[in-house]
Structure formats: structure tokens, C-alpha cells
Design a protein with these regions (language model features):
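A short, conserved structural fragment
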Residues: 370-384
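Basic, amphipathic N-terminal segments
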Residues: 1-224
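Short, cationic-aromatic polyanion-contact patches
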Residues: 385-392
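Short alpha-helical segments that sit at the start of domains
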Residues: 294-340, 362
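Feature representing long, continuous alpha-helical segments
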Residues: 273-276, 325, 329, 333, ...
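Soluble catalytic regions of membrane-associated enzymes that act on cell-envelope
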Residues: 359-370
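Short acidic, hydrophobic short linear motifs in intrinsically disordered regions
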Residues: 338-357
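Transmembrane alpha-helical hairpins and terminal membrane-anchor modules
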Residues: 213-299
Length: 392
């Protein structure tokens, strides 16, 4: 089993991280105030920094938003809006510690067995562009029932805490097919939680539910058996009569068949039984497929966190929060140590603290955090060793 990469995401709130750092009890009261002042400076810096990014994303997404209640003036519309949106969104998600899911990974996920025990089909050619980003990949184990809901088996799979889906619809999208609810030329954004890698098909708007071979057997075998019973019990007389008629018509028999009232009744009863049997099998197939579709819909109801413009605002907030957390952690550990530290030493100290104190293994982005501190004038590097600058 391949090991999953460590998370870049720090799963603690910014305000809690400040308290967690101070709870170490290694700073004097005056130095604690220095730390608090640095936290305020860091927060103000990123608030200003993300204002421009927020405006850029809003401007790029406005003409593509399927939920917009404002008119688009075509003569002022920038044709590069979609490309600009994809680029800006990718940069924002990277700062929010999301990882891009490659097409190769997505294809392998599509080929893997679904935990829903249904067959899902997605045609990516229905879209102009598809992008997927995920955060919080981890191994999970669940007991999945196998035969007739019994004999559960432990299944280990990769699960994502968060998944962002970006879809740009074609200008000539078929709104009468599986994309009935889409707006041609628009861009759809979705944010989901708790998504198994093997079930990513369910996130797409054109997902079609199919049936596995075991489900077809559960319908087909009883259908064949009951069909045999119907043939022998209810269609016996009808089949004999039809055989006699066909034999006479094709010259296989010289004995004429008399179609009296009772014969017609037998034929009608037999045909009625056959039609009723076929309708019952079609209904059984549709009901089973409807059951799977309902299970899929119920699952998505609890997994969907946000749509379209709401996704932008949410990931912007997460990106700002992540940048602040990384910077204040790097500053605190530099402030706590009297001696300057190399970036590797600082990185190891922070990761060890999370692992030992908070049972949280992560990959801290030390280079980015130190670059931000240097830009703010809160830290400087001398001979490849970093120290805080407190003369502010």
C-alpha cells in the first residue's frame, strides 16, 4: 500500500493556535505582547493581500456564474475570463493547501470499485474543462456488506476531507440530456466533504447510475425462474394452441384448428399473463435503479458544502487563514528560541511539536512562512540562520 503524503493543511483554527503557542509557557509577559503584536501585523497584512485576490476572482467569475442575478454586457465581456478564473482559483487553492488531482489519478479512480456498490458512468467529453482539487487525503476503513446485505467485509480506501470541483460547460451543451440543469458556457464550482477517491464520479452533474453484474443476476435469475413457472402454468394451453395454429399455417400439420370463443379466451388470457409478467420485470428493474439513485442523492446531500460563488469566498477565507497560521507559527518558534535557527531546524521543531503534543503529523511549509516574515520585516536571515526582528 502506497503511503499518502503528509498534509500541508494545519487542522487548527488560527485563534486556537495562538493560545496553543502561549500555553507552552516559554515566553515572558513582555515577550508575549511582542508575539501578540506580530500576530496582529500578520493578520492585517494578509487581509490587505487577499482583498486584491478576492476582487480578481469576483471579476473573473461574474460573467460565468450560473447563479448571477446581474446582466452580462457582451461588448465588455473579456473572452479570457474562463482561463483567468482557472488560474486564479488554482493559486488560491494552493495557498489553502489543496492539491490538484491529475487526469491520470481521476481515470484510475473511475476504474476502481465504488463503495456504493453501484456502477457510475461519467463522460468528461461533455465539458470544456474539468479541474479537481482535494485536501486531507487519508486512509479509512469501513465495513461494507457484500451478498444481500450480509457478510460485511472491511474495506480500506483513500478518503478526501475536502474536494473542489471546477467544470466549464460547452457553449453547445445538451441541456435536454444528463446536463439538463446546466447553463451552456457557464462555470460551475462545487465544494464537497468526506469524498472517497473511488466515488468521485458521483460529484459530476452528468453521472449515470448503472447496475453491477450481481444486481443484474438478482433480477435476471428470479425473472428466468418465474418466467419458467409462468410458461408452464399460465401459458401452457396458450402455447399448445399457438403451436397448432403455426403448424397448420406453415404446412407442418394438416389438421385444421378451430378458433372458437374458448380458444380466443385462452389466447387473450395467455397474452395478458405474458404482458403482465414483462411489465413486472421492467418495474423491478426500474425500482432497483431508482433505489441506487436515491442512495446517491442522499449521500451527496450531506457531502455538499457550497456552490459557485460561495465556493470562492470559502476557499479565499481558508487560504488567508492558512497563510496567517504558517507565518505566526514560524514567528513564535523563532521568538521562543534565543539562538537563531536554520530553516530546517525551525521546520523540524514545529512538525515535532504538532506530532508529539497534538498527535498531528503534517508537512509544514517553512520556506513560504519565512519569506512572508521577511517581507513583513518580522524576521531576517543571517548566514542561513533566522531570527526575529522585534524593533517595531
Amino acid at each position: 500500500m502506497n503511503e499518502l503524503p503528509l498534509l500541508r493543511f494545519i487542522p487548527f483554527r488560527r485563534s486556537d493556535l495562538v493560545k496553543m503557542c502561549l500555553a507552552r509557557g516559554k515566553l515572558e509577559p513582555s515577550t508575549q505582547q511582542v508575539f501578540q503584536n506580530a500576530c496582529s501585523a500578520i493578520e492585517q497584512y494578509f487581509q490587505t493581500d487577499f482583498i486584491q485576490m478576492r476582487q480578481g476572482l469576483k471579476q473573473a467569475y461574474a460573467p460565468l456564474d450560473p447563479d448571477a442575478d446581474t446582466r452580462v454586457v457582451e461588448q465588455f465581456r473579456d473572452t479570457s475570463d474562463s482561463e483567468g478564473l482557472a488560474l486564479l482559483l488554482g493559486q488560491t487553492l494552493d495557498r489553502a493547501n489543496y492539491e490538484k488531482i491529475t487526469r491520470d489519478y481521476l481515470d484510475r479512480a473511475f476504474r476502481s470499485a465504488s463503495l456504493f456498490k453501484v456502477r457510475l458512468h461519467v463522460d468528461l467529453e461533455d465539458f470544456d474543462e474539468v479541474l479537481l482539487y482535494a485536501r486531507g487525503a487519508r486512509r479509512k476503513e469501513e465495513m461494507v456488506p457484500r451478498i444481500m446485505g450480509f457478510f460485511p467485509k472491511a474495506v480500506t480506501f483513500t478518503n478526501f476531507d475536502r474536494v473542489v470541483l471546477y467544470i466549464r460547460f460547452k457553449e453547445d451543451a445538451d441541456t435536454k440530456g444528463t446536463l439538463g440543469g446546466c447553463q451552456p458556457g457557464s462555470t460551475m464550482l462545487k465544494l464537497f466533504q468526506n469524498v472517497p477517491a473511488a466515488d468521485m464520479e458521483m460529484l459530476f452533474p452528468n453521472t449515470r447510475v448503472g447496475m453491477r453484474w450481481i444486481d443484474k443476476l438478482l433480477i435476471g435469475v428470479p425473472a428466468v425462474v418465474s418466467g419458467g413457472v409462468v410458461m408452464t402454468t399460465k401459458l401452457g394451453a396458450t402455447m399448445v394452441l399457438l403451436g397448432s395454429l403455426l403448424g397448420f399455417w406453415f404446412g407442418l400439420s394438416r389438421e385444421p384448428v378451430t378458433l372458437d370463443k374458448s380458444s380466443v379466451v385462452v389466447l387473450a388470457a395467455g397474452m395478458g399473463a405474458l404482458v403482465g409478467y414483462l411489465l413486472k420485470q421492467v418495474s423491478s428493474f426500474r425500482n432497483r435503479k431508482l433505489k441506487f439513485t436515491q442512495a446517491l442523492t442522499e449521500s451527496l446531500y450531506f457531502k455538499l458544502l457550497d456552490n459557485n460563488a460561495g465556493v470562492l469566498y470559502r476557499v479565499l477565507d481558508e487560504a488567508e487563514e492558512s497563510e496567517c497560521k504558517e507565518s505566526l507559527l514560524a514567528y513564535y518558534f523563532l521568538l521562543e528560541n534565543a539562538e537563531p535557527m536554520s530553516s530546517a531546524e525551525l521546520d523540524a521543531a514545529i512538525e515535532e511539536w504538532f506530532a508529539q503534543t497534538w498527535n498531528c503529523k503534517l508537512d509544514f511549509e517553512i520556506s513560504d512562512a519565512l519569506a512572508k516574515l521577511a517581507g513583513l520585516g518580522l524576521a531576517r536571515c543571517v548566514d542561513q540562520h533566522w531570527q526575529v526582528v522585534t524593533e517595531n
